[in-house]
Amino acid sequence: MHSVRRRGLGAAALVLAAAGLLAGCTSTQHAAKRMQLDSARERAAQLSTRVTSANPLITATRVATVSGGGATAFVVTVHNGSRRAATDLPISVGYSLPGGRRVYLNAGTTLNYFEAHLPAIFSGRSSVWVYTANAELPRGARPFALVGSKPAAPALLTETNVRIRLTWTEVRAGTVRIKLDNPTSVPQYQLQVYAYAQRSGHYIAAANATVVDLGAGSKQSLTLHLVGEADGARLQIEAIPTILQ
């Protein structure tokens, strides 16, 4: 009896040890894949992005701009009319001149990755993407936004319930202090923070920021400087997860 019990305990211990090793191995693999994705995005950011042919299913349904202080914030509503979630699609913004020539404003090779690419957008959903250009549009120019069809990095969407908590206070007119909290086990690289305000259906202020690394279970603060003036309008601020695998 004793020898049988010892064998049973030994077998159970082996199973637990194997399960622990498997969990550790899986966790290590997940971490490695996330780092590989971040590296792929960093490499893609070093290439110029110019979308010339629009995606027929994932489209920019609204393109608004807010100008002030020598800058222009693009606030783009993107709708995913396809049957699948999508992520890492290229997006180009700029303006068209009266003669029809397009000027691209986010085609540089020194931008953060998500200043020329979209975070995840799920099937049938719409989301807002914000980009700030260090230039005001010339008179008569018409803003445009084009979403591409081919993802720039091989991201997976297997952890779709990731949510980043945030609180914010306006420390002075046009300046917002934001506190971020990642309560999940999924670290966020190049996390996107978007802020925008509307009045009577028109955007009157906007800003965006990239948080390079918000680790699992960690907190971080940042300051946003708005383009335009919110002037008491309701300011909406979103922290958009970029690692969902």
Model-derived features: positions:
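Membrane engagement elements in two modes
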Residues: H2-V4, G10, L14-R177, D181-Q190, ...
